[in-house]
Structure formats: structure tokens, C-alpha cells
Amino acid sequence: MPSQRVGIRVEDTELDGVLHLPAARAIGGVAVLHGFGGDPSQPHIVATCDELARAGIAALRFAYRDHQPPRMTLDSGLADAAGAIRLLKAHPDVPERLGVVGFSFGGTVAALVAGRDSRIRGAVLAAAPAAPGPSFTAWSNEGKWKPVAELSRTRARVLLVWGSRDDQVPFENAERYAAVLSQARVPNRIVTIEGGDHDFAPAGPRAKMTETVAGWMREALA
């Protein structure tokens, strides 16, 4: 699938991004957000973008301004993700059917984006913390952010994806999101990827995850 380098303007900074485009005209566009301390070239991020493009969806991956601890925060991550959504909305090859996919910390950012931006039709939270934990010091002074409550206000459909071998973000986080979403009557679904770890390795579970995410997102954006 073709891809192109893009610059994402956020405040006084330009973020480096890669836009994966389908072979035919896209049905919509999705921002794909990596995790805390990760980067957009990680195998599960690239594989997800490739599979989305094969499903007819333009997929944008990028590096946050401060993507290493301790400088990365939900404030900065949310602003960067909003910049990615703006780029997708303005791109001539991307119809205004928008979604967001986030992994780990990026999933928490995705929850905030989907809760605040009414243009988002589909949101995927993959191994996303529902509340601050010891591994997420970026939240230490950000008690104002309540991702579960904010996501409950979304107009989007929500997919919650977890690996059965994830030893970093317990499955109870998915259940917490789902309980509040269901109470708010937000359409949601939980999918467990058997054998997948926090990054959905090894290759077999990763392929199952990307197929699940891309197929679900295609329906959400239709």
C-alpha cells in the first residue's frame, strides 16, 4: 500500500507522520496512536496501519512531541492527536469519516479524543489504562483527566481490544470502560486476542488483532 510522509502542525512544532493510503479511494481516515515510551515504527503500529489501508481506510501514525517519559503527558498527547485529526480532515484524499485507534497510553488519549470530538465515528482502545497507575507517571499531576467518564459522552462506536497475555494493563480496565459505556448506551464491544501480550506479539496474535481492528473500523466508518 502507498504511504507518504506528512508534517502535523501542533502549536509551534511540526510532528513527523506517515500516512498509509489504500490502493483505491479511502472510505475514511484514522489516527493511530502509540503508547507511552513507544514510537510509531513499532511492529504492532505499522501492522495496524497497513491492515487499515488494505481495508480501504487511510491510517496516520506519528510520533508525539515528547514521547519518552517523563515529559510526555495527557495534555501534550491530546494536543498532538487533535493535530493528527485536523490533518486527516483537511487531506484531499480522505473523506470526513474519522476514527482513532490507540494502544496503551495512546488508547487513553484516544478515549479523550473520542469523548471530545463529535466527528469521531469509531474509537479503538487497545490495552488502554482506565485510570493512572504506577507505570504512568505522566498522569501524576493530571487528575482532571477522567478517560472513562469522557469516553461515555462519545458519539462513536467503541472497540476494546486486549491480549490474553497482557501483564501490564489488566483486563479489568476493559471491563471498567465497557460497564460505563453500556450504562451510557454507547455501542461497545470487547475482543480478547488469545496469546497476545501488551503489544499483541507474537506474529499470530498480532495479525488477528490487526484484522479485528480493521474490519471493525471499516463497519464503524461506513
Predicted features, each with a name:
Residues 65-92, 203:
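Catalytic nucleophile-loop/oxyanion-hole region of alpha/beta-hydrolase
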Residues 49-69:
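Conserved alpha/beta-hydrolase
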Residues 165-169, 199:
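Acidic catalytic loop of the alpha/beta-hydrolase fold
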Residues 1-25:
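N-terminal cap/lid segment of alpha/beta-hydrolase-fold proteins
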Residues 37-49, 64, 172-173:
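The serine-hydrolase catalytic nucleophile loop
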Residues 84-147:
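Primarily recognizes the serine-hydrolase "nucleophile elbow" in alpha/beta-hydrolase
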